């Protein structure tokens, strides 16, 4: 495993650990998800260069578009829950009643 692959795997793992362990606020969970998406984007951007192939060049752009949609939807949900509940604490939200 090259050092570049190790750093991207470490960044993804740290983002995943952040999502699983630091779920007190919705904003921190969204930031950890964005970190995971950024590490996936960087990994998918460098993968076709290492293979010297042009067949997978559109995959990072597709992932970038989906992560932008995910960020917009997450921020819209955070604004809606903070307006209705007054906070973005995930412990105070009962998602079955929303």
UniProtKB/Swiss-Prot annotation:
Keyword check for Cell wall biogenesis/degradation: no
A single MF term (Gene Ontology): NADH dehydrogenase (ubiquinone) activity
Catalysed reactions, semicolon-separated: a ubiquinone + NADH + 5 H(+)(in) = a ubiquinol + NAD(+) + 4 H(+)(out)
One GO term of the biological process aspect: ATP synthesis coupled electron transport
InterPro entries in the cross-refs: NADH_UbQ_OxRdtase_chain4L/K, NUOK/Mnh_C1-like
Enzyme Commission number: 7.1.1.2
Gene3D superfamilies recorded: 1.10.287.3510
Compartments in which it is found: Mitochondrion membrane
Keyword terms: Electron transport, Membrane, Mitochondrion, NAD, Respiratory chain, Translocase, Transmembrane, Transmembrane helix, Transport, Ubiquinone
Transmembrane regions listed in the UniProt entry: 26-46, 60-80
Membrane topology reported for the UniProt record: Multi-pass membrane protein
The protein's enzyme class: translocase
Any one Gene Ontology cellular component term annotated for this protein: respiratory chain complex I
Predominant location: mitochondrion
Pfam families with a match to the protein in the record: Oxidored_q2
Family of this protein: Belongs to the complex I subunit 4L family.
Function field: Core subunit of the mitochondrial membrane respiratory chain NADH dehydrogenase (Complex I) which catalyzes electron transfer from NADH through the respiratory chain, using ubiquinone as an electron acceptor. Part of the enzyme membrane arm which is embedded in the lipid bilayer and involved in proton translocation.
Protein name per the record: NADH-ubiquinone oxidoreductase chain 4L
Gene source species: Latimeria chalumnae
Gene: MT-ND4L
């Amino acid at each position: 495993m090259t050092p570049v692959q190790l750093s991207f795997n470490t960044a993804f793992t740290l983002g995943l650990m952040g999502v699983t362990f630091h779920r007190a606020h919705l904003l921190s969970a969204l930031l950890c998800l964005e970190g995971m998406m950024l590490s996936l984007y960087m990994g998918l951007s460098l993968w076709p260069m290492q293979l010297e192939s042009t067949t997978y060049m559109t995959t990072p752009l597709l992932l970038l578009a989906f992560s932008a949609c995910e960020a917009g939807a997450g921020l819209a949900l955070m604004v809606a829950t903070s307006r209705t509940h007054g906070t973005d604490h995930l412990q105070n939200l009962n998602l079955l009643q929303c």
